[in-house]
Amino acid sequence: MPAIRVSRATRALLLSVSLVLIWPAATAAARPAPNSMAVAGDSIARAFNTCWFPYIDCVANSWATGTSSTVNSHYRRILASNTAISGRNSNDAKSGVKMVDLPGQMTKISARNVQYVAADMGGNDICTSTTGAMTSVGSFSADLRTALSTITGNTNVQTVYLTSIPDAYQLWSIFQTNSSARSTWARFTVCQALLANPTSTAQVDVDRRQQVRAHNIELNRAIETVCAEFAAKCVFDGWAIFCTAFATSDITTRDYFHPSTAGQKKFADVSWRAGPFVATPTARLGPDCNPATND
């Protein structure tokens, strides 16, 4: 058999391909640890209902800026490697707010000139009295865009991290058979768009719950999309929080709605591992994830 002649150009190409195949992939670079931070958001960021005294904010337990060693917040994790952030952890979230309130929070935070801004927002935009009262995708996106334009325009701000809205449908799924949860939801009219008539199997109620979950997903898509418009500074959690399963212990039994201290700890851990300060964040997921398999 005659020898096969390989040109110099072909040999060079084969060598380059071989190097690509055998050379280890570069590890994604984590963003530098910030010297200051703040959090915007709603009652989750305020760690509502996690203190010994009920029905108050408990910012020491916040997943983002809290000081509790039990929760091990983003602030504490950063502090462990960068003591310059000590005492520079502002919680500017407010219980009960919606996305329409985020631009105002970001204006306030911008004046602080912090380097890292975390935000969780959107739970109250889906957890309304009726499905008709849920915030539209258009309004939600516009308000988020305004907020991000404000905060990313501050040259001191290096990173803005947005977490996905938790999968609220899980509340119904894990507590629908719990009589205490059902009575609490009814007495305090908790998230009635989703949690009204929790034991009903009537098609109208089944459809209503699915409508809320679908809107939950739509608003998370909006967060992902708008964040990408500010990609130089904005980081989305890749659906990590949405795709995380709740255990009953992760939800406070005071209202069967807000994260317990254990829930804040889980929120902190999941969001940190998916976030901007780790070299290899957890894999990006998506709305088709099954939270039961992504704990």
Give the predicted meaning of each segment:
Residues 1-14:
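Bacterial N-terminal signal peptides that target proteins for export
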Residues 12-24:
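Bacterial N-terminal signal peptides
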Residues 23-32:
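Bacterial Sec-dependent signal peptides at the C-terminal "C-region" and cleavage site
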Residues 31-69:
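Short glycine-rich His-centered loop
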Residues 36-48, 87-93, 115-120, 125-127, ...:
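Structural recognition of the beta-strand scaffold that forms the well-ordered cores
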Residues 53-149:
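Conserved SGNH/GDSL esterase-like catalytic core that processes O-acyl groups on lipids
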Residues 70-86, 146-161, 204-238:
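A structural motif corresponding to the C-terminal end of an alpha-helix
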Residues 171-295:
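Catalytic His-Asp segment of secreted/periplasmic serine-dependent ester chemistry enzymes
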